[in-house]
Amino acid sequence: MRRGLVALTFTLLLWLPLLVRGGQKNETQPAFQTSDRCVACHNGLITPSGKDVSIGIDWRSTIMGNSSRDPYWQASSRREAIDHPESKDEVEDDCSICHMPITRYEAKLKGKKGEIFSFFPMNTNGTKQAQDGVSCSVCHQVSNEKLGTKESFSGNFVVDAPKTKGEHPEYGPFQVDEGHQHIMQTSTGGFKPEAASHIRSSELCATCHTLYTTARGAGGKELGVLPEQMPFLEWKHSDYPAKNQTCQSCHMPEVAGDAPITAILPVLRQGMHQHVFVGGNFFMQRVLNQYRGDLGTEALPQEMATAAEGTVNFLQSQAARVTIQNLDVSGSTLRLDVKVENLTGHKLPTAFPSRRAWLYVTVRDRDGREVFQSGALNPDGSIQGNDNDADPTKFEPYYREITSGDQVRSLRTFWVTRTIT
């Protein structure tokens, strides 16, 4: 008798969304839903081995889930608008495409430009649509139209219109039966899951991770476009495509063994990828955690700390391999070669130009006393001996051989501009 009561109660709860929302089927639905409508079913995901692969918990501690809260992006956008006040509207529209995509896309549908500054500070003025950053229903609604072409870059992804009212397609990698389709469609207000292979393609990521920005001069004059962030094109010209290693292969690691993708009537699937979107920005994850009140961070402190630790581990194990070769001591002179192998499918570092990588080398004598160092980091984040850190108008030379502690072997992107009259 008790088993029958439990089954009856579960059935009533399961179909409650249908009873509540059934009359809305033919009404016009919003273009997007925020993540809170998704995580109700896509959290609480435990593999048979006991690993928690909850999609919502993983996502909300990522840079993707906090793209609109990112203080570096906020400051960069503000700086650009201050430098070019006459182009403020264009700056906000461009900078919101991939960092605040829901509000920007909805503005676009109304024939307006995207806004940024009206939502700052995010902890008080940010709407849920603005706070959600790169949300679930953004990526999972991008169609395969023009993917991989230049027309799709710089945030020019296409979101499919519903085939009928109340049937916005939400693309995923797995076939979904009619029962699960109905549950999702009724509980989200008209979003219907569909299997589509392009959701696992690098070309999907390329829509925002291939960025051409507008270079502006005096008075906001457009001088041309700048290939600012090119990780997808770098990947495309690497050996990774031939090895069938996509962006998702590294940045969304596959779960070992079977895993459920929903907590409601769960079905174990082979080949689920975790939504950790691990990259290189552990520093920003720590900032988001430390200043969570100011930035409106929703992920729990331990979740952010775990995500930052995962990023560090990812960098240390999968970004590069450093080995010492040809070690030679002659008299009081020590010579050695340092080999750095790029293990990524793109440049190292890549994407936004503020990133850099450098060699930190120390030599100690038999008593453990330091006798040489190059590339030491100062408390303020500057590198000892780096000419560019000491004077922004200078550049640290490219050294094939380091012979002094004030010489640094570093890698970063520099943009050199000149005025043509």
What are these regions, as identified by a protein language model?
Residues G23-S49:
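N-terminal module-boundary/linker segments of secreted carbohydrate-active enzymes
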Residues W15-K25:
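Bacterial Sec-dependent signal peptides at the C-terminal "C-region" and cleavage site
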Residues L45-I82, K112-T421:
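Primarily the internal scaffold of c-type cytochrome electron-transfer domains
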Residues E92, I97, P101-L109, S118:
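Conserved, well-structured interaction surfaces
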Residues C38, W73-D94, R104:
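N-terminal catalytic scaffold of extracellular/periplasmic and nuclease hydrolases
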Residues A31, S35-D36, K88, E92, ...:
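Residues immediately within or flanking Cys/His clusters that coordinate Zn2+
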Residues A7-P17:
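Bacterial N-terminal signal peptides
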Residues M1-G4:
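Positively charged n-region of N-terminal signal peptides that target proteins for export
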